[in-house]
Amino acid sequence: MTSKFRVLGAGVWGLAFSDYLLKLGHKVEVFRRDTKLSNKDITELKLYHISDDNIKSLDSLNDQKSNGEINIIAVNSKGFSELLNKHESYFRTLNEVVSLTKGLDHLSWKYFSDYVAGMFTNINKYGLISGPSFAKDLCYEKKISVSFATLDEELSSSMVDATKSSYFEMIPTTYIYHIEIAGIIKNIAAILCGMADKYYSKGVYSNVIIKKACQETWQKGIEAFNGYDGPIDVLNKDRDSIITSPGCIGDMILTCKQDQSRNYQFGKLIADADVSIEDAKSIVGTVEGYDCCITIIEKTQSTEGELSNLLYKIIKSQNTKREKLLRDFLQA
């Protein structure tokens, strides 16, 4: 069955996913600032089905009428709240939204699912796509399983069915908070893995850090339900399935062990005492783990989190003390 999609603010992942949807025979409109597909990062992808005809200016979004499309947010995390605020009149016409973007809004300190719920009472269906994959993996038809987190069974069924192929599948889950939190903590863990791989043989401490990342994800997910015994009892029963989902440990393993992860690259750079934090950021670009770590520690009321606390100490310490902080933590 053919579905209609609108992909909003698409970077390379959003474009790769749009190309995949077109390959499956769906109708896709992509709204982005740059309406040309000539960017180097884009031309390096194998995008065989998308063309300039599919691209519309993001500035025109408020003028669009909603006609049963599935809207997928595909901006980076820093652009999430900006997209919703700038195009508020468009989002007021929707009752469901799917997101490829996960993280924290650094001004309100809310998870994106909460940000949407607080801003738009009309949006009563929210879905999150998260899992172990890079954009080029989808373009090269690498076998991929991702989590699709939503509380709405109809949205879950429609997304799972519309996107399934011989090499791509969505695994449904209702645990949005844990999948969203895992997407934040994996980037913090990837920075620490990058540092550890610079100080030790590659991969020696990766599994230790990933295990702690899973524990931190679990703890922060439980925090969201403090005071509600019923949901926590259910969470405890489903703990293993949550942790082992593609959007949790699957995503962490990929991000923490791959050189192409920007957070991992950032970690390797700051492992060198001669490289400042700011220089490393300018080399790598947006570092989600760095930004989220600052927000978690300085802005939120969260108390749990070994890895968040450790990374915060590292990025606030003198350059020469970074190595000792990490070594002491790993060898404790």
State what each model feature region is.
Residues 1-60:
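NAD(P)+-binding Rossmann beta1-loop-alpha1 motif at the extreme N-terminus of oxidoreductases
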Residues 3, 186, 193-194, 222-332:
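NAD(P)-dependent Rossmann-like dehydrogenase/reductase catalytic/cofactor-binding core
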Residues 8, 12, 16, 75-78, ...:
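Conserved active-site and cofactor/substrate-binding residues in soluble primary-metabolism enzymes
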Residues 10, 33, 75, 100-103, ...:
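Fold-independent oxyanion-binding glycine-rich loops
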Residues 22, 164, 301:
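Anion (oxyanion) recognition and catalysis
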Residues 27, 79, 90, 115, ...:
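Internal alpha-helical scaffold of NAD(P)-dependent oxidoreductase catalytic cores
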Residues 51-143, 159-161:
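Rossmann-like NAD(P)(H) cofactor-binding subdomain of soluble oxidoreductases
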